[in-house]
Amino acid sequence: MTMTDPIADMLTRLRNANSAYHDSVTMPASKIKSHIAEILQQEGFITGWKTEDAEVGKNLTLELKFGPNRERSIAGIKRISKPGLRVYAKSTNLPKVLGGLGVAIISTSHGLLTDKQAGKKGVGGEVLAYVW
């Protein structure tokens, strides 16, 4: 069975593992998922990620980050642009997540960027997800 929205699947797996206090979560790998994982690591939502060769395909493993008393570093994740309803933002109208406390992941002509990086470069694009 083919997957309609692999990004939504990644975010759902991450949200469920975070809610269950798992230390890591594994999913099928792709380039865009690796770029999203890189942004999540840069912004401090996960401790690390790696791709592994499996018997069939590749797997992406994300290491979740928790505070000293097992507080979650990810309070919420929301998929914004979906296959049935794409959402785009101009460089002058980039979204702010929780007044700048969260991160919007945006697919631009310069690759995947956060809302802050896209604002500095002056580019807009497709708003993939919000993470806070």
Swiss-Prot record:
Gene Ontology MF terms: rRNA binding; structural constituent of ribosome
GO cellular component: cytosolic small ribosomal subunit
Keywords, ordered alphabetically: Ribonucleoprotein, Ribosomal protein, RNA-binding, rRNA-binding
Highest rank taxon of the organism: Bacteria
Any Gene Ontology biological process: translation
Record Gene3D superfamilies: 3.30.1370.30, 3.30.1490.10
InterPro entries per UniProt: Ribosomal_uS8, Ribosomal_uS8_sf
Oligomer and partners: Part of the 30S ribosomal subunit. Contacts proteins S5 and S12.
Job description of the protein: One of the primary rRNA binding proteins, it binds directly to 16S rRNA central domain where it helps coordinate assembly of the platform of the 30S subunit.
Family indicated by similarity: Belongs to the universal ribosomal protein uS8 family.
HAMAP family found in the cross-reference section: Ribosomal_uS8_B
Protein name (record): Small ribosomal subunit protein uS8
Annotated organism of origin: Streptomyces coelicolor (strain ATCC BAA-471 / A3(2) / M145)
Gene expressing this chain: rpsH
